[in-house]
Structure formats: structure tokens, C-alpha cells
Amino acid sequence: MAAHLSRRALTGAMTGLILAGCASQGPQHPAARTSPPPHLRSRGASDAPSLRPASADLSAPVAFSYTDSDDETSDCIFYAAGDAPVGLVVYLDGDGHPFHNQGGQSSAERSGGGLAGDGGVVEAAGARGYDVVSVRSPGDEGIWWVDDQDGKVRYLEEALDYVAVECGANTERVWLVGYSGGSEFISQWFFPAYAERMAGGGFILFGGGDAPEEEGAAAFSGDAKERLSLNWVTGTRDVPGNSVDRFDGFGHARNSLNYYRAAGFRHTWSEWPDDDHDSITEQFGRYVGRVLDDAASEK
């Protein structure tokens, strides 16, 4: 059996994304916030969305930089579903951001599945009325799960506030979708910090995840445990024997699932297909669509 490419070694040069403003439109609905939070208002954010892709070409993503209140800067790519989004899918890529970096490519150049390829996250989410934003990890290393986790949690929280205010995203339902290192960051650090702010949605983790490292991280409210849906999809062949750096995506995913079930979350689901760390990326859209459909049917 051929060994995997190392997920830690993925680097991928950043594709030349054109930083573009979004065309100004009429009132967006529904907006999760009626006014910007203080950290945005103090920097001149308006009450009405000033950014959103023109509805004439929703297939064209919009790339922009965001700098947080601690002067950390990174880039985001926003894919609009339409003028009345039902929620927001937040995608965090693996090490080197191989799929995030394809945002500036034509559809023919993108690999299948992943974030924005055929059968990918954007296709599945957009078909169900969800905007999608992919956020690159701040910091020179470009990896979500290493260094200054508190700073990265703050950065992502503020970036999502910015997307809600300036792009008119609806954050009443937020789905955190991660791959590999992005899944680790969501399950270990971001979700424990952000869950109480999520009115609906949950997370979908591909190719890994893990249990939070800090004791006491399971201080979730009973309401959060009832309203949020937590989902794991990792291949049974995503194991150390298939990875040049001995990464155990399957083991990490199961650790994460066991932790959140023990913490008392009532809506957990997992599937372990016959895939490895690479081939699972071709299934992203299929599983994202399935989770979103199941959540819609339970409302």
C-alpha cells in the first residue's frame, strides 16, 4: 500500500488571489447582527453590509484580507450562496492550506472535492443556501493547530464577526468544517471557545480532530449540548502505516468523538468509510450535504 503524502509537509504555494471588494447591494436578510461589535465599530464598520459578491456571478469567490484587534492578518475567501443565505459554513483547511489556495483557480483547475472543486464543500453548501468562508490560519507557519492557539481563536472569532457584518452572512446557523489540522483546531480549541455563541449548526470534521487538551474545557451549557450537531468522517485507512509522518487521523477522530459524547452532546454522528487521508477529500461535498440535509429535516 502506498504511503500518504505527509499532512505536516503539505505546503502549497499561495495561488495569486485578487483582493476584490464585493459589489454593494440592497438590504441583506437575515443578518445575525444589527450592529457591528465594538472591535469592528471602532474601526469604521457600518451597520449595513458593505461587501457581498454580485448575484450575477456567485460562482466567483471574493478574496480579502482581515486584520484583527491584535494586528494579526490573514486572508479569507468568501463564496456567496444568494441574497438570502440560511447560514454560514466556515472551512478550515489542513496544513499548507491546499484547498484554500485553490480559491483563485478556475473550476477546471481545481481538484475534485475539497473546498471548491466538483463535489466539494462550496457546491454542497451553496445548493442548500449556505454561504461559505474559508479562513487561512494567521501566522507565518500557516498551520491552525500549532502556536498561540488563544490568538488564533481570537482571530477567527473576529474574522467571523467581520464576515457577518461586511458580507451579510447569516450566523444563525454556523457549521465549522475542518480537514486534518483544521479539524484538530476546531475540536481542540475553537469549538470549546465558540460553542456558546452558536445559535445553531455544529461541526463536521474530516481526516482527524482530537480531544481538547486543557482540563475543564468541557464546560459546555446544557443548551449547547442539545442544539449543536457534531459529526466526524475519517477513513479507516487514515492510520500511521499509511502516513510518512505516522499521523493517525482515524485515532484522533475517535478520540474527539469519545470526548464529546462523554461531555454529554446529544447529537453526534460518525462514519468511517474505506478511505485514507487523501481520498476522503473527494467525499467532502457528499458528507456536508448529508449533514446539512439531516439537520434541516430535524428542525
Predicted regions, residues:
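Cap/lid segment of the alpha/beta-hydrolase catalytic domain
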Residues: 126-151
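Alpha-helical scaffolding within the catalytic cores
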Residues: 111-123, 159, 187, 191, ...
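N-terminal secretory signal peptides
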Residues: 1-5, 12-20
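A domain-start/cap signature at the N-terminus of enzymes
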Residues: 2, 22-88, 189, 193, ...
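Short beta-strand element of the alpha/beta-hydrolase
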Residues: 85-104
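Alpha/beta-hydrolase active-site loop
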Residues: 145-167
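The feature captures the conserved acid-bearing segment of alpha/beta-hydrolase catalytic domains
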Residues: 201-283, 287-289
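Primarily recognizes the serine-hydrolase "nucleophile elbow" in alpha/beta-hydrolase
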Residues: 165-166, 172-224
